Amino acid sequence: WQKLASSELASFKGIWAEQKQKLEGTEQFRRFNERLAREWAIETGILENLYELDRGVTQLLIEKGLDEALLDHGSTNKPTDYVIQLITDQRDALEGLFDFVAQRRPLSTSYLKELHHLLVRNQDYVDAIDTLGRHVRTPLVKGDWKRLPNNPSRPDGSTYVYCPPEHVASEMERLVEMHHAHVEATVPAEVSA
């Protein structure tokens, strides 16, 4: 793993720590972190295909805050109040993650389930395609491992096969064990990722 570590990132980490120390506690730093958290929350929902947002509206929400009034008619494909709820869930999950790290709690499968529950708090269904190729809505199980297969289709028509439901619990245990081994060996974050 040593070959994968980036010496450049280590120096950037030092620069960031120095700048953070200078700015911490200032209004500028607080606003920067708020905008960054909103951007992460909004982009997470877009990446997960929970909603679509126009780029201009995305920037407006990042800069001005999560206000339903900022969503024009036609700027999203879902009801505006629902989109704001989903974004708020993503932001709250991020805040919870920061608290988790600050408390130095060890990563566990129970925490991952807790995080999942928070991320999807206002999401009751997930859009899916059944074995016959039909678009369906299936109830979303919150805070637990998947119970049904989810193998997405690629643009070329092939299927990308994810871990089968019956193996998810053991694979997640294995992932947590790998993480703990990386922490113990002080593996750099960019390698662990």
Named regions from a protein language model:
Residues 1-193:
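FIC/Doc superfamily catalytic core
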